[in-house]
């Protein structure tokens, strides 16, 4: 498997979301940040907009729910047709139950952790998930600087995967660009969320291809 690139529409033009999805049709996933103004201070889009995007684009939808009460709100995104639905470990006392409901509704289940959240308390439940999303910025706003300290979490999980102890995709979100993607790939990331590095480029499609090449060139596990 090669590196997966997931452009984040948080950096796109919200007045032209259908067009903005189309210009990154070569991407592996389309990363959609859902924020409720409670779990994080920002407010973005919700289920109706995601449903419209799903109807307009064939790119697998990677929904990142930065919201309270994912127990209630996560399954409807799976039911709508999202490929992967990620909620935050910090937002629920029943992450395994939420993952089960997401999978039952037809999507892959992801669990996300903020930069300051220790990963160790969640290692035992990772077999219930398809994706681990490691935040490399504080969730809520795009354009922040990459926090390299989170790569220790990536390395921990990569060792487990390489040892055959776990099957999961490692995704990273925040501050990913042409330089930081190499650090993340070397640490063991599989999927890279990129906002400004894609939508801030003159040619977003070419930016996706360039990021994919850079990650694949330096990653031992992605070159296998």
Swiss-Prot record:
**EC class of the enzyme, as a word:** isomerase
The note describing how and how many cofactors are bound reads: Binds 1 divalent metal cation per subunit.
The record's SUPFAM superfamilies line, in alphabetical order, gives: Ribulose-phoshate binding barrel (SSF51366)
The cofactor required is: a divalent metal cation
Q: Which residues bind substrate per the record?
A: 8, 64, 140-143, 173-175, 195-196
UniProt-annotated catalytic positions: 33 (proton acceptor), 173 (proton donor)
Here the disulfide bonds are: none
Entry EC number(s): 5.1.3.1
**Pathway listed:** Carbohydrate degradation
Q: Which PROSITE patterns match?
A: RIBUL_P_3_EPIMER_1 (PS01085), RIBUL_P_3_EPIMER_2 (PS01086)
Q: Which UniProt keywords apply?
A: Carbohydrate metabolism, Isomerase, Metal-binding
Q: Where are the transmembrane segments?
A: none
Q: Name one GO molecular function term.
A: metal ion binding
Q: Which PANTHER family match?
A: RIBULOSE-5-PHOSPHATE-3-EPIMERASE (PTHR11749)
User: What is stated as this protein's family in its record?
Assistant: Belongs to the ribulose-phosphate 3-epimerase family.
Query: What the protein does?
Result: Catalyzes the reversible epimerization of D-ribulose 5-phosphate to D-xylulose 5-phosphate.
Write down what this protein is called.
Answer: Ribulose-phosphate 3-epimerase
**UniProt source species:** Mycobacterium leprae (strain TN)
């Amino acid at each position: 498997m090669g590196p997966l690139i997931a452009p984040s529409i948080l950096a796109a033009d919200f007045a032209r979301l259908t067009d903005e999805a189309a210009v990154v049709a070569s991407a592996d996933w389309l990363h959609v940040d859902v924020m409720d103004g409670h779990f994080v201070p920002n407010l973005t889009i919700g289920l109706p907009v995601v449903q419209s995007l799903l109807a307009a684009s064939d790119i697998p939808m990677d929904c990142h729910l930065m919201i309270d009460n994912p127990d209630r709100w996560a399954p409807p995104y799976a039911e709508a047709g999202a490929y992967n639905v990620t909620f935050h470990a910090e937002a629920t006392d029943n992450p395994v139950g939420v993952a089960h409901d997401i999978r039952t509704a037809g999507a892959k289940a992801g669990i996300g952790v903020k930069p300051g959240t220790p990963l160790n308390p969640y290692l035992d439940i990772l077999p219930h998930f398809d994706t681990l999303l490691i935040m490399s910025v504080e969730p809520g706003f795009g354009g922040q600087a990459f926090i390299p300290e989170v790569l220790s979490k990536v390395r921990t999980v990569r060792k487990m995967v390489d040892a055959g102890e776990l099957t999961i995709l490692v995704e990273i979100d925040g501050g990913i660009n042409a330089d930081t993607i190499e650090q993340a790939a070397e640490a063991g990331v599989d999927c890279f969320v990129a906002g400004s590095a894609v939508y801030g480029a003159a040619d977003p499609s070419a930016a996706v291809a360039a990021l994919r090449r850079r990650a694949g060139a330096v990653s031992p596990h992605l070159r296998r």
